[in-house]
């Protein structure tokens, strides 16, 4: 069920008292950094007792890593869990051997063992890392094993604060522990940066960049922005063609999706503004924006941003594209394993038109590894003015995407039902030779 989040409803919810919280800020990812996956505990909002989790470096989210575009990164993964694991670098167009898919790009890392991930990010933007979100590894993601990687632009846009909001949901039983399967009659606990909510304080004429990350496994995060103006500058790590305002103040983030927005400090003192999420019919406040009682940071707001071009093709010759059709559900493997043969194989430099028909009664989210896609308009050869690595497809809908297969290797193509079933309704891979 989707509820309409109107401005009055959202602002009414902002009357709750929110603690002043320090938001997560990216830290430098240096060569030789260590990411250790291990059991942990988290005191969830409203929880009677700590929840057993899995986490990187004893925090949820894990360390906020920062890298530079076209500069090499080397990170050591240490597996101190009791199960196999790897790290998938979600959204990065990196070398195939570093993509972190067990049985396809590497062997799973055994308990007590480690693996060195070395890559050079070609794109700036907001990315994140986690185990591959399918089969036995999905439960690790749901237990909190994830973090955010920010890759800086060569010349980052001028902002005064650069903040990250990581959205997650937790299906918790009466004993305070994570359920193997959600209870349909109960609603999950929603967190942002593992807290109930965040407070964002804006000085007059201050500019803030908010990096929104949907770390849930099966929830489309339907967000409503009220009481302030925002501009979308990037989606799934890549700058949009031209910055634009959210349609009617709404942003839908599929599982794994990211959207970067900028907000200027033009709030009147005493006004109420915030970001809320639709949780299966009710409103959950994620962040409150507050006009700080300080002197203006500058005499006027900063001018509109001029964004760099992504390192992706400007033009796409659709008439030359290889057309691939997929109907969901379309599990190509057996059990939780990957299929032995690729869904399709193309030569490097080929254009792929991937049509995905959702024949199920529930929303689906499909994620492509190692590449970025354009979403085509349904009635012409135009496309949306941004690139994505994950696309949401409604029940009975067909979505066509197009991408340049310019990254050699074997790449996962993965789709999951956005609901309690947690089904892998698409588990396949394709090869670029």
Where in this protein do the model-derived segments appear?
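Active/binding-pocket-proximal capping segment
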Residues: 227-239, 359-386, 418-422, 429-433
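Short strand-edge motifs at loop-to-beta-strand transitions and within beta-strands
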Residues: 113-117, 259-261, 389, 397-401
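N-terminal, post-signal-peptide metal-ligating segments of extracellular/periplasmic oxidoreductases
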Residues: 2-116, 151, 157-162, 174-209, ...
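Extended terminal and domain-junction accessory segments
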Residues: 30-34, 142-172, 241-363, 404-410, ...
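Asparagine-centered strand-capping/turn motif at beta-strand->loop junctions
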Residues: 77-81, 213-215, 356-360
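Short tyrosine-centred short linear motifs in exposed loops/low-complexity segments
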Residues: 70-71, 113, 121-127, 205-206, ...
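Hydrophobic or amphipathic alpha-helical targeting/insertion segments
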Residues: 121-151
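Histidine- and aromatic-rich segments of cupredoxin/plastocyanin-like copper-binding domains
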Residues: 98-99, 107-110, 174-310, 378-389
């Amino acid at each position: 069920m989707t509820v309409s989040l109107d401005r009055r409803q959202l602002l009414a919810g902002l009357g709750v008292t929110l603690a002043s919280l320090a938001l997560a800020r990216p830290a430098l990812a240096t060569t030789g950094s260590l990411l250790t996956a291990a059991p942990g505990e988290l005191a969830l909002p409203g929880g009677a007792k700590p929840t057993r989790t899995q986490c990187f470096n004893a925090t949820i989210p894990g360390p906020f890593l920062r890298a530079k575009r076209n500069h090499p990164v080397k990170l050591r993964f240490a597996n101190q869990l009791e199960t196999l694991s790897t790290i998938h670098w979600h959204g990065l167009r990196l070398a195939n051997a570093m993509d972190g898919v067990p049985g396809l790009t590497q062997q799973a890392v055994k308990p007590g063992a480690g693996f060195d991930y070395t890559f050079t990010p070609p794109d700036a933007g907001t990315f994140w890392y986690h185990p591959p979100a399918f089969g036995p590894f999905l439960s690790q993601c749901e237990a909190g094993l994830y973090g955010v990687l920010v890759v800086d632009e060569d010349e980052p846009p001028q902002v005064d604060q650069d903040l990250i909001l990581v959205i997650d949901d937790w299906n918790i039983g009466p004993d305070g522990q994570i359920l193997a399967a959600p209870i349909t009659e109960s609603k999950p606990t929603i967190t942002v940066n593992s807290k109930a909510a965040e407070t964002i304080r804006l000085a007059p004429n201050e500019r803030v960049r908010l990096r929104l990350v949907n770390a849930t496994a099966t929830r489309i995060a339907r967000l409503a922005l009220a009481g302030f103006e925002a501009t979308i500058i990037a989606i799934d790590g890549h700058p949009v063609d031209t910055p634009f305002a959210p349609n009617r103040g709404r942003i839908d983030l599929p599982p794994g999706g990211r959207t970067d927005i900028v907000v200027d400090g033009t709030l009147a003192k005493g006004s109420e503004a915030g970001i809320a999420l639709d949780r299966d019919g009710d409103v959950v406040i994620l962040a409150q924006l507050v006009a700080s009682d300080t002197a203006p940071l500058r005499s006027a707001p900063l001018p509109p941003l001029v964004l760099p071009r992504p390192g992706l093709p400007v033009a796409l010759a659709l008439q030359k594209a290889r057309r691939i059709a997929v109907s969901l559900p379309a599990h190509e493997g057996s059990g939780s394993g990957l299929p032995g043969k690729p869904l399709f194989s193309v030569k490097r430099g080929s254009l792929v038109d991937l049509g995905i028909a959702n024949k199920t009664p529930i929303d689906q989210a499909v994620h492509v590894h190692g590449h970025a896609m354009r979403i085509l308009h349904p009635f012409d050869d135009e496309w949306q003015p941004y690139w994505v690595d994950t696309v949401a497809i409604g029940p009975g809908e067909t979505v066509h995407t197009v991408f340049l297969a310019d990254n050699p290797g074997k790449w996962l193509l993965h789709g999951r039902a956005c609901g309690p079933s947690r089904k892998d309704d698409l588990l396949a891979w394709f090869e670029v030779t």
